[in-house]
Structure formats: C-alpha cells, structure tokens
Amino acid sequence: MNSSGIYRKVREVIDVDSRYYLVGGDYPCSNPSLLVCPWSQDILSQLDVAHRSLFPAVLTTQLALDRKGVTFLKPRTSGNSSSYVQSAMEEAHSEEWARQTIRYLSDCERHKKMATFIPSAAVYLPPPTFRPLPLAQWFETVHSNDILSHLDEMKGVITSTYGRILKMDSTKKITKKLAGGIGDSAAWISNIGNEFGQVLNSVLTSGEGAGLEELCQGVVTRYKNAGQAEPEAIYVDRDCCSQSGVSSVAKLFHPWQSAVRLDSFHFMRRFNCGLTTEHHPLYGIFCAKLSSCIFAWDQEDVQRLKEAKRAEWKSSHSGHTPTEEQLMATISPGELKRHCRRRTRGVEEIRGMISGLLESVWELTDTTGLRLVSHDSMRHVWEVQQKHLECLQDPAGVALYTKVGTLQKGGKELDILRCGRGSSSLERTPTVGYSCVFTLQ
C-alpha cells in the first residue's frame, strides 16, 4: 500500500461542545478496484492497542461521536440516559454556537467601523444557523458500537468469574422487564451466581427447569478448563434432596461433589401455603419468629457489637452506663446483619422450635376473627417440609461470611460482613456490575 494523498471522504465528528472533521490518508492497494477506507475496522484492528486507542471517535453510518462524549454514556448512575446526555450536549453545543456567533458579529462590526473610508461597502454573510444534535436513539447506537468493539474483552471478564459458593435460582421477575419484539419470547430466567452477587451464567427459557443441564454443565466446563477447584456449596430454591440419595441438582453439576443446600428464604416461603393470607397483621411477626427458629446469632459477634454500642452510648450520655434493655433498643436489625454472623441450628432443635411456634400461633386471630393459620394446610406443609431440615444445615468447614471492610463505632473496630448463604438475591435485577450472557432456548 502506498500513500496517494488525502482520502476523498471526510467524517464529521460530534464533540462535547462542537464539531470537527476526521480526515484520513488515501492508501490504495495494488489492486486498483479495491478501495481501502482509512478508518475501517479491518484497518484499525491491525493496530496494536496503544495506537488503536488514539483513534478519537466511535463511528456510525453517517456521523461519529468523540470518545469524550461516549464516556458520558457509560456511568450507570440514577437518571443517566441517552436522552439526558443528548440534551446536555445539545445545550453545550448551543452555548458554544452562541459564543462563536457573538464573536463573529463583533468582528463584523469592528471591521465595518474600520472600513468607513473604503468606497465599496463590505458585505457580511449571516452567521451559520444552529445545527441540532441527532436524536437520543443515535447516542444509543454509538454506545452499542462502543460496547461491541470491546466484546472479546467483556466475554473474557464474564467467563473468568468464579466462586466458592454458587447459587442457582429461577424467576419470572426479570423476564417481565423484557420489552419490544422479545417481550413474550421467554417466561423464566435461570441464573447461577457466586457469593459476591456476580452472575456466572444465565439462560432464558419458556418454562421453569428447561435448559438447566446446559447451563450447569457450561459452568462445570468453565471451572475445569480454568483449573479452578469445584465450589464448596451450592444453594438452590428446589430439588435440594431426593429419596434415591442423589438430588437432581447434584446430577446437573456432575461430577462435582459439592454440598447442595436449600435456601432458607424459599423454605420459609413454603409455610405461606399454610396461612390464611400473607396480608394478615401477624404475618410479619410469624416470619420473624420462623427465621429465629432456623438461625442463631454468633454470641461473640453480638458481644463485640454490644460493647461498641455501649461505648457509643456512654460518649453521648455523659458517661452513663445503659441498662441491657436500653442497649438492645439501640441495636438495629441492619447493624446485626452487617456486623454479626448467624449459624443454622441443629435439625432437632429446629424441629422442636418450629413445632412450638406453630402451637403458639395455632389459634391466633386478628381483630376481625380471621385466623393466621389454616390448620389442615399447615399440618400438610409441616409434614412435608420436615424432611428438608437437613438441607438447611450450614455445610461443615465452609466459611459462609466474607469480611468486606471495617467500621469504627464507639471507638471499637467492627468487621463488615457479607453472607454467602442463600439464592434469593438472584431473583432481582442486580444494580451494580451485573454482567451475564443470555442464551435463548
């Protein structure tokens, strides 16, 4: 290829507050019928990363957007959208156009005063009119083109995500957010995530349970190819055990020998079938009591939190020591969850406590006389769910809590903990760093 001047076409680029033109060199090939565009993807892909990063814009069919403008499309903050970026940049363009117009008219006026003694009158052209920016949809196209240019890197990041504790869950909540032509193409989404809330793999299907074998074996293959150790535990919302001894989930993740456990949230939700209504005034109290029947707080963590809160109380109450009741009243449920670990009680302890709870609420009613518990339904629910008490137990030797930071409270340093137990977090749309590959089946 030899240079023969400037390429016959130029590209208009929209900057943050102005426009400029992209000019390239003309490098004809030895074949005269073969035209080579200097900014084609085939040419740019041959450059090394350092030189490719110098290319200033993201191209579309007609126009291009400077990379400084593309940066504004990337933040996932609340309220940021292509419409917001389009309106903000158009405002910046209009202000710059107004400044340039005022400068041009001022120069014309000054030139007119200086040309008073020239016989022929000077002719001044009107300033150029303001050119609106493209619609917000064009900015979305630019953002899509920018993402596609990093597709290989994004795939590499997504498929390099692993975890010690995996969670598998199927839900309809996310598929209800699908719009457009694919709005009714899927009814369920099944996700596999790790203890950090990252999604390893997803599949969109027309029914619950479909495509799970390919989903799970894909994760197994990923671990095998990367030389990663198999997860220590897998939390699921169903099929945690089997009368034959090998659960369906264990078969899906064959040949892994990871412990399969039932998510406690889904276990407690099954008791709703034994209640008259979820809108009963005593429903919240019942759920809180049921949770306390399954879990017990780590007393060492609770004691450290109480010492920190006691010191905090003394500093704000002139050194007075609070009573136990006053101290416990200052500890919120959020603080317990943030700084204290929980463990599952033993099988027989859970069985006895839930049985006692059901006996205590058996005849409870609201002010209208509506019972909280439907007797026949609850008897059947409890009879069936007792076989899953073993599936609720914490896996032996598995650290379910991760320290993510520290916090100073009352002069004491407290750990901020993240729990890896449970799968219900996969039922909602993640808000930070959600990256996954969707497969339609």
Predicted features by range, described:
Residues C108-A233, C240:
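RNase H-like nuclease fold core
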Residues R238-D239, E300-Q441:
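Acidic/histidine-rich catalytic cores and adjacent linkers
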Residues I234-I331:
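Conserved beta-strand -> loop -> alpha-helix junction used to position metal-binding or nucleic-acid-contacting
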Residues M1-Q46:
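Short, conserved DNA-binding cores of transcription-related domains
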Residues S33-I147, L151-V157:
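Intrinsically disordered, low-complexity acidic and serine/threonine/proline-rich regulatory regions
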Residues Q41-L44, L178-I182, V203-S206, C216-G218, ...:
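Short coil/turn segments at secondary-structure boundaries
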Residues M1-R19, R164, M168, D394-K409:
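Long, contiguous regulatory modules within eukaryotic nuclear regulatory proteins
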